Every structure is written in C-alpha cells, then in structure tokens.
C-alpha cells in the first residue's frame, strides 16, 4: 500500500517523529513523507509513534488508494491539528475568534480543581504529630491510635473554628505565621471515652474540604467490631441524613483507637506537634494564600463546593487522590520546602531514608491536584478513539440481521439529543439475532464521528467476556490496542487462546461466526485517533499498571464487570480512580445484567447511577430483563444524570433522558424525565414484543412436570430417589429426541441441570452406579465450576465441539461420538451433561432434551434456551415433551422450610405455601418455556404466591423497597436508598449490600511433576520450592455400572502433557499455571477426576 504521512509536530516532538519517520519513508517535504509499505510495517510505525508521542505530537497517515483518492487511516497525537479528513488549516490565529472558551460546558471544573488543591494543602497536616514522626524514624509504632487523616481533619476543624465559609477562606487568603498558635489552642482531641463529629460545627464549604481530607485514603464507613467496639451501635438508615453531623466518629475511619495496647503517653503524642504543623512553613502559607484568593474570586465557588454537588466533590476527591499517589511516588522538590520546618511526610520504600518534607508534600499534592483537576474536562479529547469505521456502517445482507440496520439508523438520528440529554437504551432482541454486534453498532451510532467512538461492554462471566471480545474483534478487525479484553485471569485467557488456535488448525476454512453472511471487509476499515495524554501525571500513573492503562485507553473495552465496579464499590486505596475515568470518557453497555444474583443488584444499580453522574450513555442488553430491574436502573440513571447536568451542559436544561428500545421486530425512542411514564412505554413495548414472538417463534421447547418423591428426608434417600426418578426418564427422552446414524445407531445429547454442586455430585454418583438398559450406553459428563482450571477448560472445549449443532452432519465427526459409534457394540448412545448453571449463561450449546431441578423461574427459562438452540426449523418442532421439570427440588425433598433458594428468591420473609411445581406454576407458564413470565410483571401479588409472582415481588422489594415498611426493619436496605438518600460520602451501603460477597477461599493447584506421578494438591509456600503438598481434598473411588462411561475422559496426565508441548513448558509450570482451583479452607473436600472437587455429601 502507498501512504502519505503528514507531521504537524512542534518542538521536541518534531525531532522525535522525524527520526522515526525517516526510517520508514522518504521525505517529500519539510513535514511530509511518502512510501510503499506493508500492513505489518505500517502497524509497527504507528506503534513506535504512539510510544514516543508527547503533548506536541500530531501525525496523520493517508492511504493513497488511486490517482484522485486518498483516505485518512489514523492520527497519532493532537487531533486539533487536522480536520475530519486529515487536512491541515491554511491559516491559524491566536485570537479567540470563535469564542470557544465562552461555551465551555463545564460549570464546576475550576471549582473541583480548587477544592482538591485546598484539601491537598491540609490532607496530611496531621502527620506532624509526634507519634507519626516517631514511626517514620523507626523509634515508634508504625500505626497510631488515630490515623493521620483523622488528626488532619481535627486540625482543619480547629482552623475554621466558628467562622462561616467566606470568613475562613478570607483568613486562609491572608494567613500569617500566627495562625498556627490559634489553631493548636483550639484543637479538639478525641478520647477513647468520647468523640463527636467534627462536621457538626462546620459550614458547607468547610464540610466538603473536611470530607476530602478524611476520605483521601478511604471513604468513611462504620467499622463494626464486636471485639474492639462491642458497645457501639450501627447507624440507623432512617437517620442517614444526619450521619455526617451526628454519628460520624473515629470509628468510621479506623478501629485503632479501640485497641487496648496503647499507652497514655502514645495517646498524648498522637495530638502533640513539637515542631508545629505545615502552617508554620512560609512556602505552605504562600500557596494557601494563592489558592484561597483564587477561590474567593470565583463567583460559582460557593455554589458548587457543597457536598450535595456529587459530581463536583467526587471529581475533586479523584484529583486529590491521584495527585497524592503521583507526588508520593516521585522525588522531593526542594523549591517547595521551608528549610526551617524539619517535619517529614514519608520515607523511601527501598532505602527507608526520609524522602519528602511535610510542607513540601502538602504543597506538591495541592498543586498537582489543581492541575489534574483542570485536565479532567479535556481527558476525553486526549484518549484514543476510533471513527469512520466501515464495519459499523455496513448494511446487513442476511435477513435475520436486518433489524441491526434499523437500530443503527435510530441511534444515528438521536446522536445530538443523546449528547445533550443522556441515553438509556434497552436491547431485548432474542438470542441468535446478533445482539452483541447490534449493541456495538448502537453505541457507535450515538457517538460523534468527529471525536470518535469509545464504549465499554461489561459482562458477568469470564467466558462470556472472552466470547464477546472474539466476536467483535473478528467482525470488526480491530487491533488489540483498539479492542481490549479484561477478565482478571491470564491463565483463563491463555487457555481460551490455545483452544481458539486448536480449532482454527482443525478447520479447513476460517471460522466466520453467526453474523458472517456479510463479506469480509478490507483490513483498513476505520480511522483511529491515538491521542496523547496531555497530563504527564496521569500518564505516569497509568504506566505503572498495564491493566489500568488498557482499562482507560482502549476505545472499545470488553471486560468482566469487576473492573468497573470499583467506581462505586472501592472504599480505599484509590481503586475507584480508573473505572471512574473510564465512565467519564466512554459509554457503557451492560450485557445480561439480569444474570447477576439478587444480592449483587444493588451494587449494579450504584454503577448505573455513577455512569449517569459521569455523563455516560447506557445500554442494557438482555432478552429476559424483569420490569423491576429496568425501573430501578432507569431511576438510578435519572438521578445520576441530574448530578451530571448540575455541573455540565446548558444551565437549567430540564431532565429529559433520551430512551431507546430495540429488538428484532421494532426500534423506538422517546424522551422521559419521569420513571412512571417511562415504564408505561416500556410495558407497551414488551407486550408488543410478545405478540410478535407468538406469531414468529416456533414452539421448540415443550415442557412437562414429572413427579419425584422420597421415602424419607434423609440425604442419601433423597439423592437415590432423585437419581431413580431421572434415570428412566433420560431413556424416555432419548427414544423421542435422538439422531440416527446411517449405520442405524442412535445418539442424543441431553442436559440434567441441578442447582448446586454437592447435590449434583451426590446424584451423579448414584446414576453412575445404575446399569443401563440392554443395548444402551450412557456417557456422563459432570460439569460444574469446581474442576481445576485446565480440566474445566477442556470439558468446555469438548462440549463446544459436540453442542454446536448448526450443521446436522457435524455431530458424527465429533471425536467422542464417532468413537462411541465405531468402537461400541451398543445401538443406543445417550450423552448426558450433569451440570449446574455453568451450562447456561455464556454457553452457546444446543441439546436435544433436558431434565431440570427447579429453584426459580429463571432456572427453568435458562436451560430451556439451550434446547434446539441452533436448529430453528419446523422439522425440529417436538410432538412430545423435550424438557422434564422435576416437581420438587432436593431442598424440598429434604423437608426444608425454604426450598427455592441459593439460587432462588424464596426466603423466611418471602416464603411459598407449597414446593410442588404443579401448584406453583400454571400450565401456560411452563408448557412452552420462554422469557414471557420474566419480562411481564403479574397483575397481582396476592398470596399464595406463584413461582413467577415470588420472583417479581422479591426483585421489587430488593431494588425499590416496600412502601409501608420501615427501613430499619429490613435486613438489607433497598437499592433505591442509594439515589434517594444520597449517602455517597460514605461506604455504608457498600458495606451492607456488597458486590459478590463470598466466603474467604485459598488457591490450590492440582500438581503433576512427572508422567508417572499421581496428581496431588499443592499450595504455595515460603519454602525453597515455593510449594508444599496439601490434603485439602481427599481422593474418592467411583463405581461405574455396566453400560456407563465417561463422555469426556478426565485424563489429567494427557491434558497436562498436551499443554506442556504446546507451551514448551515443564509439567510443573503447567501445573502451577493451569491447575488452579479456589477452595474454602474450613470445609471438607473430596476429589475424583470425573466428579471434580466437591463437599461432604451426607
């Protein structure tokens, strides 16, 4: 390809880019180069330019396609040097002709910059106390009864005293050395027996600065401890509005002061300042006068600097924390030190020597916070983006995907409106309709092509995240820098890549996926704006962590939601910074948000609230979204958008969010600022969707309820009874729903789906011991999350191979099925996956039939979606049931009062009158299982509750609360409490309703060091080898009856050997990397290669 390169760099950037470009191309002028180059060479050139890009870099690359046609490929650096076509202006002027600064949409940018700066001056003044200084020198304890930020808060409280905001700010703007004497004289010291809230007496601006000071390491949260603080009472939700002024105490910061080991002298030293505070430093006072003077001259400062301005104060906190991280990591700045003030802020981690003086550190953090705050409004313009992408614009040629074109056109039509008013969209298209790609096209359509497109897709599962990343990369031909996939486990990613490579080697033609009816595009199908981070502080911070760099920089980010959740859920350590910046600079797609457990939904609502507050446009994507969840998420987004419009955009713009609905039948949009009207429109869309589905969809799922009972409630009797109920019915289903080979042998692939691992394994052991009928072989696969990593990946790979049923003849080529037909004498072969919910979400599998243990309505709908998933044709419509639903689950058979739980929605407060599925469901709700019961709310919640009504009722209560119920009577606050009471300044709701709370577990590894050694479990150790043997899981034996075999052979030696050969590694390395499994230490565990790891069964 022939390319033209134009450089508009200045200063040192020009020298650097000339050096690089001269190595690749021939100069055609002072700032232009031309050459013929391969695609690989061009990618290398771009990477080199990006690596050395600085503030003044600006290089455009044009592809000379024909005599009179060039096409812009990419821009590295400053986009403002070029127009959308990559052309350079004829003339430039320094005069502000367009008055662009008069139209700055940020109202509070200078406010949050100055808030961070003033707080930066005070944030560590408490480190001047004698006990902290003794700890730094090594002569005292490393911690103190009261943490330095609490002491800093008390010092700031003393500085403000009884002045109002204007008065104390004026005092700061004229501060002299005498101020410290008055401050120390009025300093309030906390005692173990008494402490009141410092915020009680502070005026609004001072409250904000005080909150920034005390929260610059960790958000205040009530530290509950029956051991250290047995008499302290938990704050009541009904008084949340007064927590700050009436309840806040040192216990919200730490529990150090409650420990009984402190001597009276140490407690005194915590409040003594033998060398004074930084107010003694002339350098500190000079900077304080400057910052306070600027604040007093800013007309909007008082209005935007109150704690109810959520966006402003949280961006101030972000700038402060980032400045603290950045400045603490650097060297000392002598110019900011007063040589007469001998107090230190920190030590060098490597040498242990003193590093930065305290006055210098506070000044440095304040100055850097000011500059960082000022750079935040421009951050979006300096980050990489993609635009003019032909793949997003190309029309679908396959009729099945034409609805994507309508969705894209609608998104383009509301681009400007969504930019001004925000966007909340819902994509409810059915599985197999290309929802993933449609979501990407919708977000691209909403983006301004002049600045490029940036969006994140957040998912709940690693597997689904990897699949989504593959689908988009394959379809859009995006580079790794342009599309980043983050899942938090390099081992899982490695195994996924190896599986993909194996599949490609086995196939004669490249795999093209479900949307590949479109022809492949040319390699150059989009323009990439690389940008260059203007702020060196942010750039330096990002470069310390490749994951953070990817999280913020990638134009398209496919990630497990865990990487974005810290935006609201991280309470300490600055982990909220990167995800907050991502939400500030990119739109958000939530894929299958209803797949999260009930207990995780409040945190999900907080994330959507924060996305609205940070200006993101949000798209929900799922065909099974319950109305209560949609109501809660839209309500959360509305509230967040209100906070955004306070600080950004045209003043007094009414709240009127642009809303969109998409499915394969229709696309609609309207603007709403009210939840009630929004839900009326949503319900109408859903009802029309169901009508369309009734006309369009084939009845491929035909379910019936089968009775199951046990002679006693004893665990062994129950497991045997369930096995005996399942066993004959598998053969019934096989006889009705199988495929026949040309040699007369029959094969069916079935799913037996159970709720929990331990009962699953218990039932599996019983089934494995029951002989098969004559001339029949049953092949079992026990599939759940507690197999070591390599084996789980292998199981999934082999299931993928067998259960991709787009091509009917492909089944006979699958290795396990081909061997069973060729080498076995039996005529009938039943392949059964005994699985938990891992067989559903994120697995694009197609089974012939299923037997399902009920735990919720969702537990019935999800497995049903895997029946005849790929064979959408009239010839496959069943005449007899292909789904059997057990009438009772294992908990019910064991006589538990609460049976439809874990997973499920039943609890002591919301219980069912019966556990018999016959009585819990009407025939129309299960006969042809679909998403309908989940996406339409029942008209009544009168008792006795049905299984469908229970689900909707509990969702409503968890997310929105009950009208007549006192908050403090609830075990957990409803999700809506977050955006109704706005306790954003603390982490109390995050403590009470955490995201993905689980028991503490440890990493173990199934270890094979040599071919002739038996596998053993190992755990990491401090010894010379780094590992030691563990007896965490005891091996068990397994009895397999006649006519029973393994579907997927669990041969760990062969599997590890294959991975070792592919990676060119030792077996021990393979074990360490791919043999991991996480287990809770306090439980008894057992292990078998076929069964995986499981708990005690009776």
UniProtKB/Swiss-Prot annotation:
Q: Which GO terms describe its molecular function?
A: ATP binding; helicase activity; metal ion binding; nuclease activity
- List where the motif DEAD box lies: 591-594
HD Cas3-type domain location, by residue?
Answer: 102-327
**Applications reported:** If the spacer DNA has a perfect match in the chromosome then toxicity results. Suppression of the toxic effects occurs via mutations in the CRISPR/Cas machinery, or via target deletion, which might contribute to genome plasticity. This CRISPR/Cas system can be used to remove genomic islands, and possibly other genomic regions.
Q: What other facts are recorded?
A: The N-terminus (1-about 100) might be the equivalent of Cas2 in this CRISPR subtype.
The opening ranks of the lineage are: Bacteria, Pseudomonadati, Pseudomonadota, Gammaproteobacteria, Enterobacterales
- Record the organism: Pectobacterium atrosepticum (strain SCRI 1043 / ATCC BAA-672) (Erwinia carotovora subsp. atroseptica)
UniProt gene name: cas3
Q: What does this protein do?
A: CRISPR (clustered regularly interspaced short palindromic repeat) is an adaptive immune system that provides protection against mobile genetic elements (viruses, transposable elements and conjugative plasmids). CRISPR clusters contain sequences complementary to antecedent mobile elements and target invading nucleic acids. CRISPR clusters are transcribed and processed into CRISPR RNA (crRNA). Might be involved in the integration of spacer DNA into the CRISPR cassette.
> EC?
3.1.-.-, 3.6.4.-
| Highest taxon listed in the record's lineage | Bacteria
Q: What is this protein called?
A: CRISPR-associated nuclease/helicase Cas3 subtype I-F/YPEST
Name the residue ranges with Polar residues bias: 504-515
Q: How does it assemble?
A: Interacts with Cas1 in the absence of crRNA. Probably interacts with the Csy ribonucleoprotein complex composed of cys1, cys2, csy3, cas6f and crRNA.
Residue numbers binding Mg(2+): 124, 216
Q: Which Pfam families match?
A: Cas3-like_C_2, Cas3_I-F_Cas2
Annotated GO biological processes are: defense response to virus
* SUPFAM superfamilies in UniProt: P-loop containing nucleoside triphosphate hydrolases
């Amino acid at each position: 390809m022939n390319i033209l390169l134009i450089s508009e760099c200045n200063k040192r950037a020009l020298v650097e880019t000339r050096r690089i470009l001269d190595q690749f191309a021939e100069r055609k002028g002072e700032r232009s180069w031309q050459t013929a180059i391969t695609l690989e060479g061009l990618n290398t050139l771009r990477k080199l330019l990006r690596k050395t890009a600085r503030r003044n870099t600006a290089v455009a690359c044009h592809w000379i396609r024909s005599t009179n046609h060039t096409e812009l490929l990419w821009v590295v650096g400053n986009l403002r040097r070029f127009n959308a076509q990559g052309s350079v202006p004829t003339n430039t002027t320094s005069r502000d002709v367009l008055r662009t600064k008069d139209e700055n949409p940020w109202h509070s940018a200078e406010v949050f910059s100055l808030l961070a700066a003033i707080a930066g001056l005070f944030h560590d003044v408490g480190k001047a106390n004698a006990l902290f200084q003794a700890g730094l020198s090594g002569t005292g304890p490393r911690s103190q009864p009261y943490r330095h930020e609490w002491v800093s808060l008390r010092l700031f409280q003393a500085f403000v005293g009884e002045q109002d905001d204007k008065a104390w700010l004026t005092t700061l703007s004229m501060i002299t050395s005498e101020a410290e004497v008055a401050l120390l004289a009025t300093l309030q010291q906390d005692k173990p027996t008494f402490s009141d809230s410092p915020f009680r007496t502070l005026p609004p601006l001072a409250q904000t600065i005080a909150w920034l000071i005390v929260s610059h390491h960790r958000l205040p949260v009530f530290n509950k401890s029956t051991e250290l603080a047995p008499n302290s009472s938990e704050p009541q939700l009904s008084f949340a509005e007064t927590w700050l002024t009436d309840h806040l105490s040192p216990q919200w910061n730490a529990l150090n002061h409650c420990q009984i080991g402190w001597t009276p002298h140490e407690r005194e030293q915590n409040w003594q300042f033998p060398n004074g505070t930084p107010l003694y430093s002339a350098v500190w006072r000079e900077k304080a006068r400057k910052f306070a003077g600027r604040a007093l001259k800013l007309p909007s400062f008082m209005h935007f600097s109150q704690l109810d301005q959520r966006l402003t104060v949280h961006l101030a906190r972000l700038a402060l924390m980032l400045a603290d991280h950045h400045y603490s990591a650097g060297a000392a700045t002598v110019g900011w030190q007063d040589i007469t003030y001998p107090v230190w802020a920190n030590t060098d981690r490597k040498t242990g020597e003193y590093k930065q003086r305290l006055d210098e550190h506070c000044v440095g953090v304040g100055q850097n916070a000011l500059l960082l705050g000022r750079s935040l409004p421009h951050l979006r313009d300096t980050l990489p983006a993609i635009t003019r992408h032909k793949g997003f614009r190309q029309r679908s040629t396959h009729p099945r995907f034409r609805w994507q074109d309508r969705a894209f056109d609608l998104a383009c039509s509301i681009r400007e409106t969504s930019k001004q008013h925000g966007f909340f969209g819902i994509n409810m298209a059915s599985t197999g309709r290309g929802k993933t790609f449609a979501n990407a096209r919708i977000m691209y359509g909403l983006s301004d092509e002049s600045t490029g497109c940036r969006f994140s897709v957040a998912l709940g599962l690693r597997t689904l995240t990897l699949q989504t990343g593959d689908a988009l990369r394959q379809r859009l031909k995006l580079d790794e820098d342009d599309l980043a996939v983050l899942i938090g486990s390099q081992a899982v990613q490695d195994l996924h890549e190896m599986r993909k490579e194996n599949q490609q080697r086995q196939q004669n033609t490249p795999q093209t996926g479900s949307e590949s009816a479109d022809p492949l595009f040319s390699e150059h199908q989009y323009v990439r704006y690389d940008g260059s981070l203007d702020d060196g502080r942010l750039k330096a911070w990002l470069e310390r962590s490749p994951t953070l760099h990817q999280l913020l920089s990638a134009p398209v980010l496919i990630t497990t939601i865990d990487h974005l959740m810290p935006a609201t859920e991280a309470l300490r350590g600055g982990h909220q910074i990167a995800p907050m910046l991502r939400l500030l600079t990119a739109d958000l797609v939530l894929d299958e948000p209803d797949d999260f457990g009930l207990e995780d939904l409040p945190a999900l609502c907080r994330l959507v609230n924060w996305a609205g507050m940070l200006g993101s446009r949000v798209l929900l994507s799922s065909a099974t979204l319950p109305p209560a969840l949609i109501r809660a998420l839209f309500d959360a987004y509305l509230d967040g958008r209100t906070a955004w419009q306070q600080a950004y955009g045209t003043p007094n713009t009414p709240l009127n969010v642009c809303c969109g609905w998409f499915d394969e039948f229709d696309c609609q949009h309207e603007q709403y600022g009210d939840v009630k009207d929004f839900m009326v429109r949503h319900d109408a869309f859903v009802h029309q969707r169901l009508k369309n589905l009734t006309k369009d969809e084939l009845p491929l799922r035909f379910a019936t309820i089968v009775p199951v009972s046990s002679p006693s409630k004893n665990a062994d009797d129950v497991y045997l009874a369930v096995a005996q109920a399942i066993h004959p019915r598998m053969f019934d289903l096989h006889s009705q729903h199988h495929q026949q080979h040309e040699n007369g042998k029959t094969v069916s692939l079935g799913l037996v789906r159970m709720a929990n691992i331990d009962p699953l394994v218990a039932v599996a052991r019983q089934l494995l011991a029951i002989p098969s009928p004559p001339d029949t072989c049953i092949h079992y696969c026990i599939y759940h999350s507690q197999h070591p990593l390599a084996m789980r990946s292998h199981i999934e790979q082999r299931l993928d191979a067998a259960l991709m049923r787009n091509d009917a003849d492909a089944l006979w080529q699958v290795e396990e099925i081909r061997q069973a037909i060729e080498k076995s004498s039996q005529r009938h072969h039943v392949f059964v996956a005994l699985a938990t919910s891992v067989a559903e979400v994120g697995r694009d599998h197609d089974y012939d039939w299923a037997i399902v243990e009920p735990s919720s309505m969702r537990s019935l709908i999800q497995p049903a979606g895997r029946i005849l998933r790929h064979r959408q044709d009239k010839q496959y419509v069943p005449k007899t049931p292909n789904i059997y639903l057990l009438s009772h689950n294992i908990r019910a058979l064991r006589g538990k009062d609460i049976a439809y739980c874990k997973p499920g929605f039943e609890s002591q407060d919301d219980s069912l009158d019966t556990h018999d599925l016959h009585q819990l469901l009407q025939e129309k709700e299960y006969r042809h299982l679909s998403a309908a019961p989940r996406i339409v709310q029942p008209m009544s919640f009168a008792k006795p509750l049905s299984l469908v009504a229970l689900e909707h009722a509990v969702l409503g209560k968890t997310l929105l609360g009950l009208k007549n119920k006192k908050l403090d009577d609830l075990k957990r606050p409803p999700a809506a409490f977050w955006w109704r009471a706005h306790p954003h300044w603390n982490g109390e709701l995050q403590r009470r309703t955490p995201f993905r709370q689980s028991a503490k577990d440890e990493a173990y590894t199934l270890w094979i060091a040599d071919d002739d050694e038996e596998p053993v479990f190992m755990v990491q150790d401090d010894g010379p080898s780094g590992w030691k043997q563990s007896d965490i899981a005891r091996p068990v034996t397994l009895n397999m009856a006649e006519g029973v075999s393994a579907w997927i052979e669990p041969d760990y030696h062969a599997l590890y050997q294959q991975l070792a050969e592919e990676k060119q590694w030792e077996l021990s390395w393979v074990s360490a990397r791919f043999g991991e499994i996480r287990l809770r230490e306090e439980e008894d565990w057992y292990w078998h290669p076929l069964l995986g790891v499981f708990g005690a069964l009776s």
